[in-house]
Amino acid sequence: MISHVSRHIRLILALPLFILASCLPAFAAPQAHASPSAADSLLPGPKPADVPFDWKRIIGIYGKDHSVLLLERDQELFYRDSTGVDKKLIPINSGMFTTDPNDPPVIKINLPAAYSLSNVPFLGISDKTWPRTDPSDNPGHFYHVSPAPPVAELRRKALKLTPPTEPGPFREPDLTEIVNLDAGFHLEIRYARYDNFLSAPVYTQARAFMQRPAAEALLRVLHKLQPLGYGLLIHDAYRPWYVTKIFWDATPPEGKIFVADPQKGSKHNRGCAVDLTLYDLATGQPVEMPGLYDEMSPRSFANFPGGTSLQRWHRDLLRRAMESEGFSVNEDEWWHFDYKDWKQYGILNVPFEKIALGVEPKAVSHKP
């Protein structure tokens, strides 16, 4: 499995400038109140209509250097070439398109019946073909690492270690369990499950905590989104330092750009970062975003130009709502948001089960 990560990193480094340019940040103006009118002001324009399922099966990234995108805009399919030029796709018949009916280079999209990492769709023009290089909509197509030694052994070793000290002073920790604030918060804690990049649980409990000011800000975000028909689905929040150490030790050298350095700690370790998405209040189901949670591909960029209009709209709505209450997005991960006061808190290393027992968390710090 490590080879998949290595291959993917090479693709990221070779990402064309047109995609990188399209992913530059575009910041939203904060909103202040949770009234219906204020909630409406968070909307990133009119809500687009969804697209046919067959379109979603082919919309994505193609080419080993991520040189081609198929995307949807205004209920039309577009082909974006390696120079960043968008061309509208005109259907000829099943799986066949052209960009110019008068002088048609035929674009063929092959969609296998069984989609797997070794059997992916490909796009062909003349004698050139580009395989699809993102995991589509299936979390089973993630890139994984196979740590040696296994996660259980890495956890045993990490729990014996002490986080690095930092100059203080810091605020006293006040970790708050998010779901206790409102039933509108739902949990899907991936690192307490097997469907994560390690293919193994790292947490012993599926719980989510944040420092109280951050948790209360997140509650205000939820109250702004609820009138619009959305709730918040939490994937991760406070992360004990030993888990960051596990991630670091489990990841091969070429993959460490995707994980936090335990010698520096992370915003998750401070209880001031949260990984989350939207869910539909009517169905209870997560909404579709341009990419999947924890996906190691350009679809994770906060301003990735691909996907469908509705997927981008949902992603931008989440960002606008979070930024309105003092959170900032990680530009490489549309789901990751940091609270504005994170520098005021030190690194914590209290496991979830000890928080439940009332163990007071302490930052590992010293005064200068």
Predicted region positions:
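Bacterial N-terminal signal peptides that target proteins for export
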Residues: 2-13
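Intrinsic disorder/low-complexity segments
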Residues: 6-7, 32-35, 362-367
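Bacterial N-terminal signal peptides
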Residues: 12-25
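Peripheral terminal and inter-domain segments
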Residues: 28-152
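K/E-rich alpha-helical interaction surfaces of small helical-bundle regulatory domains
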Residues: 57-68, 322-326, 333, 338
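A mature extracytoplasmic/lumenal domain signature
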Residues: 83, 93, 103, 191-193, ...
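Extracytoplasmic cell-surface/polysaccharide-interacting catalytic and binding patches
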Residues: 140-235, 250-332, 341-368
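Beta-rich nucleic-acid/ligand-interaction surfaces
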Residues: 241-247, 337-344
